[in-house]
Amino acid sequence: IRDRQCPAPEAIRAIAVDTTASTPCLVDRTCTPLSLTAGYEENPDAMFVLWKDHTAQRESEEITALCARGEINYARRSGNHYSSECFWSKVLHLLRGSERLRRDAWAVVELCDWIPAVLTGCRAMEDLRSGLCAAGSKVMWAEEWGGYPPEEFFAGLDPVLLPILRRLPVRTYGCDTPAGTLSPEWAAKLGLSEQVVIGVGNVDCHSGAVGAGICHGTVVLNLGTSACYMAVMPPEKMGDRMVEGIFGQVDGSILPGMVGFEAGMSAFGDVYAWFKRLLCWPLREVLLPVSYTHLRAHETCADL
């Protein structure tokens, strides 16, 4: 696969990526994941944390409680609840668990922001273009409170988060915005032109909604490991209303110029996989071992 070349590289004008979210990773000053640096190769906490990791439940509850006590509820755009699947829950859990990680982590990057950074040759957080869809739905970014919640909020939660907050890009960009062009290094690797435009990263389900032709008056369901239900609404029809129970209500997400809504079930395909394993337990643990033993006995007799 590494040796394959595009038969018509001149036909490729742009590349855009979407990933699961929140899928954050601790990085060094050059935006390199710590897992790609010496001494962290086998440390799972230095790798990207998969979106469906729910280890940070305690941190999720702390953040939700702090939001509820504040003058501004910074979880109001996620149904007044901040999930353990989301950015700050995971980052807080990682940093609390390791003094070494706290020392070596310069910043934290979402996977959907990191891949465009790699492709464009971005090596500094101040140059990174942060995608609105992930920042708004997973990282508590909102224009109404000037970006991310203020330092006072995070200081009240745990001061360990303050250096990470200060290094996050303040501005966010929609998925219709270029992040840059293909770097010389990656142009050579891929056999493509350096003029290929790299799009700002997006959340996977949001891209699926766009691909399905989402528009005002429709609902799109993305069914897989999870089940995500999405809709969009013109902002003039919404006003200041917040929809209770929506996982993410973000101005400008999914479709630029619209209010994007995201909700659903964290476990969908995973539940079916669990149910299959449950039903198949007798086959795996009883029938198959017996059949295997019976087969081996026949083979042994034949050998004798």
Task: Annotate each predicted stretch with a short phrase.
Residues 2-37, 41, 104, 163, ...:
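N-terminal glycine/serine-rich phosphate-binding loop of ATP-dependent small-molecule kinases
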Residues 16-18, 110, 221-224:
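Short beta-strand segments
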Residues 47-93, 97, 141-147, 250-292:
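Glycine-rich phosphate-binding loop plus the immediately following alpha-helix
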Residues 203-281:
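Catalytic phosphate/nucleotide-handling subdomain of diverse soluble enzymes
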Residues 27, 64-202:
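Gly/Ser/Thr-rich active-site cleft segment
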Residues 1, 293-300:
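Conserved small/polar residues in nucleotide/adenosyl-binding loops
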